Swiss-Prot record:
ATP binds at G233, P234, F235, G236, A237, G238, K239, T240. GO terms for molecular function: ATP binding; proton-transporting ATP synthase activity, rotational mechanism; proton-transporting ATPase activity, rotational mechanism. PROSITE patterns: ATPASE_ALPHA_BETA. GO terms for biological process: proton motive force-driven plasma membrane ATP synthesis. The keyword Ion transport applies. Keywords: ATP synthesis, ATP-binding, Hydrogen ion transport, Ion transport, Nucleotide-binding, Translocase, Transport. Produces ATP from ADP in the presence of a proton gradient across the membrane. The V-type alpha chain is a catalytic subunit. InterPro entries: ATP-synt_VA_C, ATP-synth_a_Xtn, ATP_synth_asu-like_sf, ATPase_a/bsu_AS, ATPase_F1/V1/A1_a/bsu_N, ATPase_F1/V1/A1_a/bsu_N_sf, ATPase_F1/V1/A1_a/bsu_nucl-bd, ATPase_F1/V1_b/a_C. This is V-type ATP synthase alpha chain. It comes from Streptococcus pyogenes serotype M1. It catalyses: ATP + H2O + 4 H(+)(in) = ADP + phosphate + 5 H(+)(out). Its EC number is 7.1.2.2. One of its GO terms (cellular component) is proton-transporting ATP synthase complex. Belongs to the ATPase alpha/beta chains family. The gene is atpA.
């Protein structure tokens, strides 16, 4: 422990002298109030400290004390359903302890509740050899999540004691005799530095799709479990709603939602909505599998920078248990702005648009902690982290540095489009500019698992939308009637795909989520209509007669998005109805 004194205060940056024994990334207590700070630069005996709390009233001459430890998070039972700030302070217990609706400075509250007791059930017995990552026992944390207590990293040896019963997170639950003869006494909790990724046995290629229930994503731009996706878009295009929808309905075990520098009412929406929503995969409340990290725009800027790392470290902990985890960061642009502010105060050489030169490597560090892995431990298991980051480019200009550096790393780009949002087409993901590099892997995975021709259907649907885009210029110049019958059909089918399939109402109880079998049935109906109508045109039928003769069945296809999942056979039955109606048009002569 080293004590120095403040010589300069510049917003969230404090410079202290007499810190020659301190190290970069050490946590400090700053000033008489004991504010939490982290050393981000050392020059001789002077340390530049990033303070995670408001620094007003702090002045030169006040003491700075280092703890000798890096910024770390507590990992153990009690994380799920909890809401933390950027440095893992529990906000509900903070409010009760301080009796204030605001963050009182200098208050230290442990991240995990020290009084709560958890029922520990051992899975191993005394005398067994254990290595780092082995599961010693379980705690039923919520109705959905079984918390697996693991041997900490760099600990291995013979299990000499393990106890069943109710324990707090600090009680000794097991003892391991290590190779050097020392006894390691372990509890239900472990700590981990947030800026250091947790080790794994092996990184694997992600192949299984993350089913989000959003048709435009699952069909055209899928992301895999263990993949990374970016959602850039201008103000009002629906970035936060897309993130909320994925957090609500994705087929993952655990969701970490990081509200980083966005508006406070968006986190309020999460807190109000999530407890009432039922997870379609488990039948339980969505909060039973969610961890919230709130670092809204009116909280200290420096803590934004830490909040992303706090979230990904908690995600890695649950991944190591063998769970599939999704982490939402809303928004990484605000995080990058925090980096820019600290870089400016350190008087570093600026890069593009004032962002630090190391912006690209910091963004890469975050997204590279996602992935599908084989975890440490003698019991073989796999875990995944899917990272989905919203990007808020000023004015929707995706050529700015944060978006460009993000797109170099992620493999999925869901480009939100202001004109689509203005036309009230939501999700406003532009199908012509967005892309997914997982499309082929996911398509072949689904074809193999479902024994269906899914990837071919997706290719045909996208070809229709692209053909529509190339015809739109002609239509604007000379009108729809100037097109050939086949091209008019293409325009009509493309409109069906856009309005009846891609457009989705997040606030409708049925349309908000679409399972994969329902998506396949809906898309099959539209493509069947296109195929049968094309045949009818080639046999001499007129476009107008086909449209008039199939008006009723097309209306039923349009309404199929509002048919509940349990009535899936109604949607599948429309395929034969489409064929029958078009054959009926041909039987009448079609001329």
């Amino acid at each position: 422990m080293n004590q120095g004194k403040i010589i300069t205060v510049s917003g969230p940056l404090v410079v202290a002298s007499g810190m020659q024994e301190a190290n970069i990334q050490d946590i400090c207590r700053v000033g008489h109030l004991g504010l939490v700070g982290e050393i981000i630069e050392m020059r001789r005996d002077q340390a530049s400290i990033q303070v995670y709390e408001e620094t007003s009233g702090i002045g030169p001459g006040e003491p700075v004390v280092t703890t000798g430890c890096p910024l770390s998070v507590e990992l153990g039972p009690g994380l799920i359903s909890e809401m933390f700030d950027g440095i893992q302070r529990p906000l509900d217990r903070f409010q009760k302890a301080t009796d204030s609706d605001f963050l009182i400075r200098g208050v230290a509250i442990p991240s995990l509740d020290r009084k709560a007791k958890w029922a520990f059930i051992p899975k191993l017995s005394v005398g067994q050899e254990v290595v780092a990552g082995d599961i010693l026992g379980t705690v039923q944390e919520t109705a959905v999540i079984e918390h697996r207590i693991m041997v900490p990293y760099k600990v291995s040896g013979t299990l000499v004691a393990i106890h069943a019963g109710d324990f707090t997170v600090t009680d000794t639950v097991y003892e391991i005799k290590q190779e050097d003869g020392s006894i390691y006494q372990g509890s239900l909790m472990q700590t981990w530095p947030v800026r250091q990724s947790r080790p794994v046995a092996q990184k694997l290629i992600p192949v299984e799709p993350l089913v989000t229930g959003q048709r435009v994503i699952d069909t055209f731009f899928p992301v895999t479990k263990g993949g990374a996706a970016a959602v850039p878009g201008p103000f009002g295009a629906g970035k936060t709603v897309v993130q909320h929808q994925i957090a609500k309905f994705a087929n993952v075990d655990i969701v970490i939602y990081v509200g980083c520098g966005e508006r406070g009412n968006e986190m309020t929406d999460v807190l109000n909505e999530f407890p009432e929503l039922i997870d379609p995969n488990t039948g339980q409340s969505i909060m039973e599998r969610t961890v919230l990290i709130a670092n809204t725009s009116n909280m200290p800027v420096a803590a934004r920078e830490a909040s992303i790392y706090t979230g990904i470290t908690i995600a890695e902990y649950f991944r190591d248990m063998g769970y599939s985890v999704a982490i939402m960061a809303d928004s990484t642009s605000r995080w990058a702005e925090a980096l820019r502010e600290m870089s400016g105060r350190l008087q570093e050489m600026p890069g593009d648009e004032g962002y630090p030169a190391y912006l690209g490597s910091r963004i890469a560090e975050y997204y590279e902690r996602a992935g599908r892995v084989r975890t440490l431990g003698s019991q073989e298991r796999e875990g995944t982290i899917t990272a989905i980051g919203a990007v808020s480019p000023p004015g929707g200009d995706i050529s700015e540095p944060v978006t460009q550096n993000t797109l170099r790393i992620v493999k999925v780009f869901w480009g939100l489009d202001a004109p689509l949002a203005q036309r009230r087409h939501f999700p406003a993901i532009n199908w012509l500019t967005s892309y997914s590099l997982y499309q082929d892997d996911v398509g072949s995975y689904i074809d193999r698992k479902q024994q269906s021709n899914w990837s071919n259907k997706v290719t045909r649907a996208m070809a229709i939308l692209q053909r529509e885009a190339s015809l739109e210029e002609i239509v604007r110049l000379v009108g729809l009637d100037s097109l050939s019958e086949q091209d008019r059909l293409t325009m009509a089918v493309a409109r069906q795909i856009r309005e009846d399939y891609l457009q989705q109402n997040a606030f409708d109880s049925v349309d908000t989520f679409t399972s994969f079998p329902k998506q396949e049935a809906m898309l099959t109906n539209i493509l069947t209509f296109n195929e049968e109508a094309s045949k009818a045109l080639s046999l001499g039928a007129y476009f107008n007669e086909i449209m008039e003769g199939t008006a009723q069945v097309r209306d039923r296809i349009a309404r199929s998005k509002f048919i509940p999942e349990e009535n899936l056979e109604q949607i599948k039955g429309l395929t034969q109805k489409v064929t029958k109606e078009i054959h009926h048009v041909l039987a009448k002569g079609g001329i």
